[in-house]
Swiss-Prot record:
UniProt cross-references to SUPFAM superfamilies, sorted A to Z: Ribonuclease H-like
Top enzyme class: hydrolase
Protein name: Crossover junction endodeoxyribonuclease RuvC
Gene3D superfamilies documented for this protein: Ribonuclease H-like superfamily/Ribonuclease H
Record note on quaternary structure: Homodimer which binds Holliday junction (HJ) DNA. The HJ becomes 2-fold symmetrical on binding to RuvC with unstacked arms; it has a different conformation from HJ DNA in complex with RuvA. In the full resolvosome a probable DNA-RuvA(4)-RuvB(12)-RuvC(2) complex forms which resolves the HJ.
Subcellular location as annotated: Cytoplasm
Keyword list, A-Z: Cytoplasm, DNA damage, DNA recombination, DNA repair, DNA-binding, Endonuclease, Hydrolase, Magnesium, Metal-binding, Nuclease
InterPro entries for this protein: RNaseH-like_sf (IPR012337), RNaseH_sf (IPR036397), X-over_junc_endoDNase_Mg_BS (IPR020563), X-over_junc_endoDNase_RuvC (IPR002176)
Sequence positions that bind Mg(2+) 2: E68
Amino acid sequence: MRVLGVDPGLTRCGFGVVDGGNGRTVTPVAVDVVRTPADLELSSRLLRISEAAESWIDLHRPEVVAIERVFAQHNVRTAMGTAQAGGVVALAAARRGIPVCFHTPSEVKAAVTGSGSADKAQVTAMVTRILKLAAAPRPADAADALALAICHCWRAPMIERMARAEAAAAEQKRRYQARLAEVKKAGTR
């Protein structure tokens, strides 16, 4: 499975592609960070990120895009910009019919380090080790993008099993409710 991991941000947006194999085998394909100047209008910055996402998707042809979920930050403005950057990447993937999955920072940290509270240095060190890289990806946004892709490769089978279980439970509930309605209807005759 080829996964494009994206660490969204207005100033620096990390992109990382890995190929996931059997078990926990992952192979690095590409990594980079797209930068946008703070003095540009927001719309221009988002356009640059969107164009970069489209280019990465067209070049690397991922089966899925994994984006960091923004849920809380102390600086509301930063959180909004990060969410907007993630949104334009999700839109670029959706336009190409590519599924998008969101992972929280703690999910990503736990997947690659074993601890949901790991710091950036620990995440970078483990990404370097897992992917057998000669040097650590820099800046941290690049390592985070690769970590997101790794996380998704490792969590995808579980996510798929959960989706199948939820679908089966919903079908079972539908059948039960239909049978219950039949019994009630028969009892009122």
